[in-house]
Amino acid sequence: MPKRHHHTESRLNNLSVNADPEHPVYREATTEIQKRLRYMVDKHSQVFVGHLEFRFPPEMETQNNNRHISNAIRKCRMKLKREGIDAQLVWAREQRNSDQPHYHCYPICDGNKVQHVQRVAGFFNEIWSREIDASPESNYVRYCPPQEQADSNTGIRIRRHGSDAETQLHNASHWMSYAAKVNEKEKTPEGCRMFGFTQIPKA
């Protein structure tokens, strides 16, 4: 994603985003997030969106690349596929004052197969723990429920034929656009990606 333009309005591509003049988001990243959200909503009668945070052990020295998260996301996608769960994954790297980055990941899942994010978080925590050589009990992956519009307080569910489908679509776009915020990416090393997205299958 070579071009990065700031977006400061509360809507983009006819969907709600969490942005204003003091809290811009990257337009290109937000658009990629929305593409994956719309793809899943068009494909499945129900879509469940969760939010996971990946961190490193405080004593671990991290490199100026995204090798660990890239490996983990690839393995997480494979795990979900083996479990029969269709999903698109979005991740963002953040690093402001800390010596270590942390990552936000939004799994956009077939809501007929995923009822709450804890199951997905468990898969991801096991994979991340192996990737960073940590104990799964350390829980360096945790889920972050939305403040509002939560389904069982763990994520956002969009039911295609539900009376609140359009509202929940906007809620999900607004929630996920947090990953595209400009703030807290100041220490991203030059040449290091800030975002990652699983590929949408070609029609």
Where are the predicted features?
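Signature for HUH/AEP ssDNA processing cores
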Residues: 35-95
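Glycine- and acidic-residue-rich phosphate-binding/metal-coordinating active-site segment common to enzymes
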Residues: 85, 94-98, 121-125
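A general alpha-helical scaffold signature found inside nucleotide-binding enzyme cores
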Residues: 71, 106, 119-123
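Histidine-centered divalent-metal-coordination microenvironment in nucleic-acid enzymes
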Residues: 90-113
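Residue-level signal for well-ordered alpha-helical segments
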Residues: 29-31, 82, 105
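Catalytic "initiation/cleavage/transfer" segments centered on a nucleophilic residue
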Residues: 1-46, 62, 111-203
